[in-house]
């Protein structure tokens, strides 16, 4: 009986996602799994020459500054 109970507990632990982490885009196609304390995905524009802008993406603890910041808290929301 103890063996059955232990088996059920182990299966439950393996099936549950006890350590949920956020996944954000780091580049245009590249993704990164955020650290547990990073709860925000961000995207903002870095001014470049000739009126162009380079997007910066990643994980953070708060919404950063920058041109046209976009911050969100769901997986892959900073495309």
UniProtKB/Swiss-Prot annotation:
GO terms for molecular function: acetylcholine receptor inhibitor activity; ion channel regulator activity; toxin activity. The keyword DNA-binding does not apply. It is found in: Secreted. Expressed by the venom gland. Keywords: Acetylcholine receptor inhibiting toxin, Disulfide bond, Ion channel impairing toxin, Neurotoxin, Postsynaptic neurotoxin, Secreted, Signal, Toxin. SUPFAM superfamilies: Snake toxin-like (SSF57302). Residues 1-21 form the signal peptide. Belongs to the three-finger toxin family. Short-chain subfamily. Type III alpha-neurotoxin sub-subfamily. Binds with high affinity to muscle nicotinic acetylcholine receptor (nAChR) and hinders acetylcholine binding to the receptor, thereby impairing neuromuscular transmission. Competes with the binding of alpha-bungarotoxin on muscle AChR (from Torpedo) with an IC(50) of 0.30 uM. Causes muscle paralysis, spasms and increased respiration. This is Short neurotoxin 2. It comes from Pseudonaja textilis (Eastern brown snake).
